Amino acid sequence: MSAASALGNKIPRYRRRRPLPAVIMLVVLGVLSVFVWTKVFRSTSDIDAATNCNPPTPPSTAPEGQAPPKAGQVLGRDSLDRTDPAVPSRVQVRVLNANGQRNQASLVAEELYAAGVNKAAEPGNDPVYPNFDMHCHGQIRFGPNGAGAARTLSLLVPCAQLVRDERQDATVDLALGSKFGDIKPNHAAKRVLADLRSWGERQPTPEGGQAAEAGRPPIEANLLAEARDVHC
């Protein structure tokens, strides 16, 4: 008896693969992808809104013959992402009161000095916001030569808005808004600052006392991103 006869002349039927589970999986993955990207865009939009500062109002009584200072150009939050941060000891900052809270500028300045940055000038009132009506966390203002210093300061004050003005030196201003809290760098920011300090100490100091920065500081890009990944 042949094998076909033994099986009763029955040919095994081809079992079709059901595409439904695969389709369901593709749909689920698509929904998850849309959810993740929506969350990313929403988070970016939220933090942009949270760090945005209102424009200054004109002073009620301006000194005769004296033009109000220019507010500068507001930059995007990621505008300094490709800029190497400066060593903290080479950052010179002036803290300004733009919210009307007494003594806050002096207290914040002391916190910054404790973090390793230096004083550019004594804390004072903000000439750009003479009515003390800055309703945001604050602004970091700098010129073309102070981008590295501003990058370092943005690690300490990640919720401050970046503003580029026409100053020619490397000093940086930190103007405090009504939503400003205090200086609280996260773990990643502390690591970056420590690495910058360590790298700066290893750089040669030529005659004249001014250290020459050779090369780029070996700072991990993911640490820089994490240092500013905060809730504002």
Language model features with spans:
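Short, charged N-terminal helix-start/capping segments
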Residues: 17-25, 74-85, 206-213
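Intrinsically disordered, low-complexity regions
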Residues: 4, 8-11, 71-72, 77-80, ...
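Intrinsically disordered, low-complexity segments enriched in small/polar residues
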Residues: 6, 63, 70, 74, ...
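Extracellularly exposed regions in secreted/surface proteins, prominently low-complexity, repeat-rich
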Residues: 47, 178, 182-232
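Extracytoplasmic low-complexity, Pro/Thr/Ser/Ala/Gly-rich segments
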Residues: 44-113, 121-123, 127, 228, ...
